[in-house]
């Protein structure tokens, strides 16, 4: 069941309708003819059942919003604190807890393990034809590195060198 566009809409609804909200919703960050939105989000976590094409959660559920843009995250955080609830697919959902994970960037070389909370989609498009890749395809690593570098440049986030390897 696909609900990602609903969650994306919920996140955008937390932004003000002024220049800031307009920037995040309509403009985004640019680099080399590419446009990047400033955030990503996870799937919904929690126990649920599907009834009439709707997710029915048995208890609490949660999801993650992630961004390099602190201003974006602070705006989302303040809006949630003020409202104490979200409107998700015409359902009022009470917020019980909100936390900010302070993941500091690091300098130098460091081995880290990244687990994606949502599937990665790796593809290239040429002449209106898209080619999709599996993480095990040798081209995937270059696409991932280039994507990270392009996003860092679009966000004006400094990187000197990006060493990246996929272990299976």
Kindly give the residue locations of the regions a language model identified:
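RNA-interacting cores
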Residues: 1-168
